[in-house]
């Protein structure tokens, strides 16, 4: 039996044979050129293998290779084999104009090769620089080989655009292509001052061979005037570019008005629908056709029944997805078609109608047209290929073992994975619905008439099995609940055989699952979190994914178990007995913490955040409550894979444990909803404050409205009594108003590592004195006293010169410290 590849190959060969049956067009002899001149450009880097090949006629008699008009010699690096030249371990001196000259009875022919061996390192940003080393420039440079020449611009037309406005995170390149004798030097200024790589985070690259400067991942602080100065001993020239970095404005996809357009075609015609999508975050595009199910176009939940005609694959480009092709349409193809595009912000859609009319009879003139034979040939080939495709589809449909309730099986794109559903699907037509998990939300049609959105039967969803992570349900023993939210819960469990090399080993784990009243959005978020944890990988200081149960039952996500709870409760439980505001002043703390222990906590969290940042993961909710502690006192960051709707944050709503999330948010996240690694650094600074107050609440007693005002005016929290000046300055650096001026997590890890190494294990905290400037360990119920001047966390007292360990800090008196 032929494979489908063989069948398609056979159809193509038949088509080619039919095409070859036509007489080939011929040109008169006088149309043949007597001599052809060709120029090819070749670029290479030092050490590359350079290969030049000359195309020859059959009757060629002699071949001669020259470089810059001089016979090309053969040596230990250069080998000439007739029509081919090979240069091993290329060097910049191998650059030049190569020529292959051939003679034959039919005439002579010369092919030119412009070769540039650049001394710059290979870079993806230099793809547009090939013209800088063209033969024209070399000829210009060679016109005055021994004369003194002041610097000059070689391509001034490429420097006409002076203002460059780009979105944040883009790569910017400024070029000043120049010439001169002797070869001039290049240096760059920013806003009239010397510009060094350490003047910006990430530095910059200079390509001296292409007279350019390259800055990756630009941020607003990169705005300014950039001046290139090209000079030698005979003169100096300069040129200034202006850079404006525009902050990204996240929004759901924008679809071009009027597209797709309505179509009216004859039976058997081909139809093309076009949908133009504009989106800053990567969009996911699907084409849908509205269908009827049991005589109805609308389901019991008032959403239309649709069939997914086209969805993005692994290698599908957005341009390909913007066009829907329908071949040989029938009356059944008539109806409403929808282009639906979504990104991490939301979804948008436009619809169009297809009307199919009876085909008109062909006129006799059409049958006698000179193109008739060609049409028959291509139609025959298309028919054969269509037959092969249909055969393959039928074969695959018969080979599948899954049963469907309707004629087709549809799929949902879920983080580059398909989640097949067992029933006909419906897609929400609400353009403003959230897609924070980055997936299309698809729901199964209900067999009953109930319109409830709840997942009464989560098992209706069939997730694809991932052998790397799948754990049989009979090897998971569920235990007591550890915690729960509105629609999800976490339980303690024992997993058998997580380690493939130790199939009988029992491991304590935590299992995330949905409650019975969870919605499809909750299921989508849980799947998204699981897939995110798979992609991020494992690290000692994050909660790692251990496995999952996705088959034959509800979804279980198996993660590491942290026996000592979250960091905030861990710190509060270890407050000294005499310390005010501890949960139970009469009980003995579980263990006494040293100053080094607290710095170690901060160091471990910074390491985890450094790893997440390296994986391009932005946490958005870093706080002590989202850091878990294992039995061995290892800090593990949790909830980094959660899908969060940042556009619907209730700034005045407390979390389940009474904390206000806004108190950990950076100003740009709070006011403009801009979340970056730098906004996570701000949250880390607040977490540092929590650590050195042993679980204190930030800004106690400060109303949200007042907090907004204080942050805008530059006020910051005062130094905790049990931290050094160096650590407090680290907090203040994290709270810098300009995001680009905050330290990176890499820098924080290095600084904290140094502090840990220099700190003695015996420096225990003297926390027996009241810390009345910090909040109690329970939800804020002291609003009347916390807002008083005696309880303010702000101060304008100058920083002490000596470390504040161990000593009793003076009470502040309501004054404010300005950043």
Curated annotation (Swiss-Prot):
Residues 121-150, 780-801 are annotated as: Disordered. Glycans are attached at residues 76, 116, 225, 238, 262, 294, 315, 328. GO terms for biological process: epicardial cell to mesenchymal cell transition; fibroblast growth factor receptor signaling pathway; positive regulation of cell differentiation; positive regulation of cell population proliferation; positive regulation of DNA-templated transcription; positive regulation of MAPK cascade. ATP binds at residues 482-488, 512, 560-562, 566, 625, 639. It catalyses: L-tyrosyl-[protein] + ATP = O-phospho-L-tyrosyl-[protein] + ADP + H(+). It is found in: Cell membrane; Nucleus; Cytoplasm, Cytosol; Cytoplasmic vesicle. The chain crosses the membrane at residues 375-395. The active site is at 621 (proton acceptor). Residues 25-118, 145-244, 253-355 form the Ig-like C2-type domain. The keyword ATP-binding applies. The modification Phosphotyrosine is found at residues 461, 581, 583, 651-652, 728, 764. InterPro entries: FGF_rcpt_1, FGF_rcpt_fam, Ig-like_dom, Ig-like_dom_sf, Ig-like_fold, Ig_I-set, Ig_sub, Ig_sub2. It comes from the Eukaryota. Disulfide bonds join 54-100, 176-228, 275-339. GO terms for molecular function: ATP binding; fibroblast growth factor binding; fibroblast growth factor receptor activity; heparin binding. Keywords: ATP-binding, Cell membrane, Cytoplasm, Cytoplasmic vesicle, Disulfide bond, Glycoprotein, Immunoglobulin domain, Kinase, Membrane, Nucleotide-binding, Nucleus, Phosphoprotein, Receptor, Repeat, Signal, Transferase, Transmembrane, Transmembrane helix, Tyrosine-protein kinase, Ubl conjugation. Residues 1-21 form the signal peptide. Residues 781-790 have a biased composition (Polar residues). It is a single-pass type I membrane protein. The second and third Ig-like domains directly interact with fibroblast growth factors (FGF) and heparan sulfate proteoglycans. Isoforms lacking the first Ig-like domain have higher affinity for fibroblast growth factors (FGF) and heparan sulfate proteoglycans than isoforms with all three Ig-like domains. Monomer. Homodimer after ligand binding. PANTHER family: FIBROBLAST GROWTH FACTOR RECEPTOR 1 (PTHR24416:SF131), TYROSINE-PROTEIN KINASE RECEPTOR (PTHR24416). This is Fibroblast growth factor receptor 1.
């Amino acid at each position: 039996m032929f494979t489908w590849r063989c069948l398609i190959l056979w159809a193509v060969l038949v088509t080619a044979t039919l095409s070859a049956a036509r007489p080939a067009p011929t040109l008169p002899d006088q149309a043949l050129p007597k001599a052809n001149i060709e120029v090819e450009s070749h670029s290479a880097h030092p050490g590359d293998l350079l290969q030049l090949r000359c195309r020859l006629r059959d009757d060629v008699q002699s071949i001669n290779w020259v470089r810059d008009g001089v016979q090309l010699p053969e040596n230990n690096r250069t080998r000439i084999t007739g029509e081919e030249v090979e240069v091993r371990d290329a060097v910049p001196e191998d650059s030049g104009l190569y020529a292959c000259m051939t003679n034959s009875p039919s005439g002579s022919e010369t092919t030119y090769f412009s070769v540039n061996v650049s001394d710059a390192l290979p870079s993806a940003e230099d793809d547009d620089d090939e013209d800088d080393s063209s033969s024209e420039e070399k000829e210009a440079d060679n016109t005055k080989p021994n004369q003194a020449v002041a610097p000059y611009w070689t391509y001034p037309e490429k420097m006409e655009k002076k203002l460059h406005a780009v979105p944040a995170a883009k790569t910017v390149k400024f070029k000043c292509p120049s010439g001169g004798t002797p070869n001039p030097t290049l240096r760059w200024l920013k806003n009239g001052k010397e510009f060094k790589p350490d003047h910006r985070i990430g530095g910059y690259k200079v390509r001296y061979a292409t007279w350019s400067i390259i800055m990756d991942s630009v941020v607003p602080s990169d705005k300014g005037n950039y001046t290139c100065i090209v000079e030698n001993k005979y003169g100096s020239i300069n040129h200034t570019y202006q850079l404006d970095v525009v902050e990204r404005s996240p929004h759901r996809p924008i679809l071009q008005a009027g597209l797709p357009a309505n179509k009216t075609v004859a039976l058997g015609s081909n139809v093309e629908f076009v949908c133009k999508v504009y989106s800053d975050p990567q969009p996911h595009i699907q084409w849908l056709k509205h269908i009827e199910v049991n005589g109805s176009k609308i389901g019991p939940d008032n959403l239309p029944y649709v069939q997914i005609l086209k969805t993005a694959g692994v290698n599908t480009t957005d341009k390909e997805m913007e066009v829907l092709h329908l071949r040989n349409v029938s009356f059944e193809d008539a109806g409403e078609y929808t282009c639906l595009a979504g990104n991490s912000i939301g979804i948008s859609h436009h619809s169009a109608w297809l009307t199919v009319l009876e085909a008109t009879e062909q006129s006799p003139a059409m049958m006698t047209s000179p193109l008739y034979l060609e049409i028959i040939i291509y139609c025959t080939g298309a028919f054969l290929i269509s037959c092969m495709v249909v055969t393959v589809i039928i074969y695959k449909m018969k080979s599948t073992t899954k049963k469907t309730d309707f004629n087709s099986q549809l799929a949902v794109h879920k983080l580059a994975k398909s989640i097949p559903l067992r029933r006909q699907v419906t897609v929400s037509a609400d353009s403003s619905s959230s897609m924070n998990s980055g997936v299309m939300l698809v729901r199964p049609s209900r067999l009953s008439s109930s319109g409830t959105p709840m997942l009464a039967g989560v098992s209706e969803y069939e997730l694809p099995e991932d052998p790397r992570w799948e754990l049989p349900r009979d090897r998971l023993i569920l235990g007591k609940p550890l915690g729960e939210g509105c629609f999800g819960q976490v339980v303690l469990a024992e997993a058998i055989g997580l380690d493939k090399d130790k199939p009988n080993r029992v491991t304590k784990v935590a299992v995330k699952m949905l409650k019975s009243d969870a919605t499809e959005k909750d299921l989508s978020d849980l799947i998204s979190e699981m897939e995110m944890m798979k992609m991020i990988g494992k690290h000692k200081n994050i909660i790692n994914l251990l496995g999952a149960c996705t088959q034959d039952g509800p979804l279980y996500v198996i993660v590491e178990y942290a026996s000592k709870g979250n960091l905030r409760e861990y710190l509060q439980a270890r407050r000294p007995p005499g310390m005010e505001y501890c949960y139970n002043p009469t009980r003995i703390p579980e263990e006494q913490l040293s100053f080094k222990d607290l710095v170690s906590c901060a160091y471990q969290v910074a390491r985890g955040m450094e790893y997440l940042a390296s994986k391009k993961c932005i946490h958005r909710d870093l706080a002590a409550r989202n850091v878990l502690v294992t039995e061995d006192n290892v800090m593990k960051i949790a909830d980094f894979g959660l899908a969060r709707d940042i556009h619907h944050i209730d700034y005045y709503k407390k979390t389940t444990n009474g904390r206000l999330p806004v108190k950990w948010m950076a100003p740009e996240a709070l006011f403009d909803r801009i979340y970056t690694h730098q906004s996570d650094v701000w949250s880390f600074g607040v977490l540092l404050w929590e650590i050195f107050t042993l679980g204190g609440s930030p800004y106690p007693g400060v109303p949200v409205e007042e907090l907004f005002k204080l942050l805008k005016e530059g006020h910051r929290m005062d130094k905790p009594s049990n931290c050094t000046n160096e650590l407090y300055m680290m907090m203040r650096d994290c709270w810098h108003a300009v995001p680009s001026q905050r330290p990176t997590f890499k820098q924080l890890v290095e600084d904290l590592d140094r502090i840990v190494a220099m700190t003695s294990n015996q420096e225990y905290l003297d926390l027996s004195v009241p810390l009345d400037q910090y909040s109690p360990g329970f939800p804020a119920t002291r609003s009347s006293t916390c807002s008083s001047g005696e309880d303010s966390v702000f101060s304008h007292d100058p920083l002490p010169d000596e470390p504040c360990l161990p000593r009793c800090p003076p009470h502040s008196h309501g004054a404010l410290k300005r950043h």
